A protein has these predicted regions:
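Short helix-coil junctions and helix-kink-helix linkers
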Residues: 35-44, 123-134
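Short, amphipathic alpha-helical interaction segments positioned at domain boundaries
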Residues: 165-185
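Short helix->loop/beta-hairpin flanking segments within DNA-binding domains
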Residues: 104-115, 180-183
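Minor-groove-contacting beta-hairpin "wing" of winged helix-turn-helix DNA-binding domains
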Residues: 158-164
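A short, conserved structural fragment
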Residues: 147-157
């Protein structure tokens, strides 16, 4: 039997950011998460699912104790677009192994080509998650989150490309990002 997918709703990066800020300030609650979710979804079932996902992406995230310990560095990093992309991607990947597995697949293909198709990702992910019917739905939740975070682009429907940050264009970091992208994430 394959792994479980675990995510079935897209959560806006802005919502994750607000939830993390509330959690770091000590004012996060289940009701706060429900209020955030109600801004994105209608209906009690969808709001409850989203509330659970928001909690998992913020206060119940395995990275939260580390971020809480390094709160000042976190706030400084959130001011830089490239750092934000890595932070949000890390939060998603730490909370959901599906996100991590999708990122590994993307990284392997970005290592050798500039574009990756949705169908290619689905084919590779089905070897991990079997022919789970929730696989395409989960991918359509995770990929827009990566796009909104600023990690990847979608130049056309079903095609994804890496994001290059100008701050890295003339530094050795750009070489590392181009050649070892799948290791970094």
């Amino acid at each position: 039997m394959g792994k479980t997918v675990g995510i079935n709703q897209r959560i806006s990066i802005n919502v994750i950011e607000m939830a993390m800020k509330a959690a770091l300030e000590g004012c996060y609650s289940s009701e706060f998460a429900a209020d955030l979710a109600s801004g994105e979804y209608e209906g009690s079932n969808r709001i409850n699912k989203a509330r659970s996902i928001i909690g998992r992406l913020s206060i119940r995230n395995p990275l939260f104790p580390f971020i809480e310990e390094h709160k000042n560095e976190y706030y400084v990093a959130m001011k830089h677009k490239s750092d934000r992309a890595i932070i949000f991607t890390s939060l998603i990947n730490a909370a959901y192994s599906f996100g991590y597995d999708a990122m590994v697949v993307l990284g392997k293909f970005f290592h050798v080509q500039d574009e990756v198709s949705t169908q290619l990702i689905l084919n590779k992910m089905s070897s991990i998650y079997a022919s789970n019917r929730s696989l395409p739905n989960a991918l359509y939740c995770i990929m827009p989150m990566y796009i909104e975070a600023g990690l990847i682009n979608r130049p056309k429907t079903g095609i994804y490309t890496k994001v290059y940050y100008e701050a890295f264009l003339h530094l050795p970091v750009n070489y590392i990002l181009n050649h070892f992208w799948f290791i970094i994430i």
